[in-house]
């Protein structure tokens, strides 16, 4: 099951857990109130998984690819890692399914505090359009993930501040319960 927690304020190595002290765990229900969706799947059978196919069909995730993030396989690795960790939003959902390895998605809560979501093999997450977030590897420096999209793949990050985009306006309304 996924683990999530409020982060400390440290700017040290982002690959470390950065748990607030005292520890402030975050459950799936709290993540759902932010629009974050989570599934635990069997990553060993991702190529022929009826549960994954049902999720894709229900949510219209019609396109996918696989990305491996590690120094040996990702061109411009250092540049990409910095870009992924820059706080940003997207105009569409961001959907990731961890097939191997691990990393962290950080998302902002309703009070603009960071929540760290630990992602490991078998974890699938959907971040809503308009949520400020970032991604980093953990100390293992390796993740292989399936990226899913509705229609043609679009992965355009808009670094904060990006409050003027309709996706952000709609997300804030969702948080306020008025969407």
Swiss-Prot record:
<keyword id="KW-1003">Cell membrane</keyword>
<dbReference type="GO" id="GO:0010308">
    <property type="term" value="F:acireductone dioxygenase (Ni2+-requiring) activity"/>
</dbReference>
<feature type="binding site">
    <location>
        <position position="90"/>
    </location>
    <ligand>
        <name>Ni(2+)</name>
    </ligand>
</feature>
<keyword id="KW-0539">Nucleus</keyword>
<comment type="pathway">
    <text>Amino-acid biosynthesis; L-methionine biosynthesis via salvage pathway; L-methionine from S-methyl-5-thio-alpha-D-ribose 1-phosphate: step 5/6.</text>
</comment>
<feature type="binding site">
    <location>
        <position position="133"/>
    </location>
    <ligand>
        <name>Ni(2+)</name>
    </ligand>
</feature>
<feature type="binding site">
    <location>
        <position position="94"/>
    </location>
    <ligand>
        <name>Ni(2+)</name>
    </ligand>
</feature>
<dbReference type="GO" id="GO:0010309">
    <property type="term" value="F:acireductone dioxygenase [iron(II)-requiring] activity"/>
</dbReference>
<keyword id="KW-0560">Oxidoreductase</keyword>
<keyword id="KW-0408">Iron</keyword>
<feature type="binding site">
    <location>
        <position position="88"/>
    </location>
    <ligand>
        <name>Ni(2+)</name>
    </ligand>
</feature>
<dbReference type="GO" id="GO:0005737">
    <property type="term" value="C:cytoplasm"/>
</dbReference>
<dbReference type="InterPro" id="IPR014710">
    <property type="entry name" value="RmlC-like_jellyroll"/>
</dbReference>
<dbReference type="GO" id="GO:0005506">
    <property type="term" value="F:iron ion binding"/>
</dbReference>
<dbReference type="GO" id="GO:0006555">
    <property type="term" value="P:methionine metabolic process"/>
</dbReference>
<dbReference type="InterPro" id="IPR027496">
    <property type="entry name" value="ARD_euk"/>
</dbReference>
<comment type="subunit">
    <text>Monomer. Interacts with MMP14.</text>
</comment>
<dbReference type="InterPro" id="IPR011051">
    <property type="entry name" value="RmlC_Cupin_sf"/>
</dbReference>
<dbReference type="GO" id="GO:0005634">
    <property type="term" value="C:nucleus"/>
</dbReference>
<keyword id="KW-0472">Membrane</keyword>
<keyword id="KW-0028">Amino-acid biosynthesis</keyword>
<protein>
    <recommendedName>
        <fullName>Acireductone dioxygenase</fullName>
        <ecNumber>1.13.11.54</ecNumber>
        <ecNumber>1.13.11.53</ecNumber>
    </recommendedName>
</protein>
<dbReference type="GO" id="GO:0005886">
    <property type="term" value="C:plasma membrane"/>
</dbReference>
<keyword id="KW-0533">Nickel</keyword>
<feature type="binding site">
    <location>
        <position position="94"/>
    </location>
    <ligand>
        <name>Fe(2+)</name>
    </ligand>
</feature>
<comment type="function">
    <text>Catalyzes 2 different reactions between oxygen and the acireductone 1,2-dihydroxy-3-keto-5-methylthiopentene (DHK-MTPene) depending upon the metal bound in the active site. Fe-containing acireductone dioxygenase (Fe-ARD) produces formate and 2-keto-4-methylthiobutyrate (KMTB), the alpha-ketoacid precursor of methionine in the methionine recycle pathway. Ni-containing acireductone dioxygenase (Ni-ARD) produces methylthiopropionate, carbon monoxide and formate, and does not lie on the methionine recycle pathway. Also down-regulates cell migration mediated by MMP14.</text>
</comment>
<keyword id="KW-0486">Methionine biosynthesis</keyword>
<keyword id="KW-0223">Dioxygenase</keyword>
<dbReference type="GO" id="GO:0019509">
    <property type="term" value="P:L-methionine salvage from methylthioadenosine"/>
</dbReference>
<dbReference type="GO" id="GO:0016151">
    <property type="term" value="F:nickel cation binding"/>
</dbReference>
<dbReference type="InterPro" id="IPR004313">
    <property type="entry name" value="ARD"/>
</dbReference>
<keyword id="KW-0963">Cytoplasm</keyword>
<feature type="binding site">
    <location>
        <position position="133"/>
    </location>
    <ligand>
        <name>Fe(2+)</name>
    </ligand>
</feature>
<comment type="similarity">
    <text>Belongs to the acireductone dioxygenase (ARD) family.</text>
</comment>
<dbReference type="Pfam" id="PF03079">
    <property type="entry name" value="ARD"/>
</dbReference>
<feature type="binding site">
    <location>
        <position position="88"/>
    </location>
    <ligand>
        <name>Fe(2+)</name>
    </ligand>
</feature>
<feature type="region of interest" description="Disordered">
    <location>
        <begin position="1"/>
        <end position="23"/>
    </location>
</feature>
<feature type="binding site">
    <location>
        <position position="90"/>
    </location>
    <ligand>
        <name>Fe(2+)</name>
    </ligand>
</feature>
<dbReference type="GO" id="GO:0016491">
    <property type="term" value="F:oxidoreductase activity"/>
</dbReference>
<keyword id="KW-0479">Metal-binding</keyword>
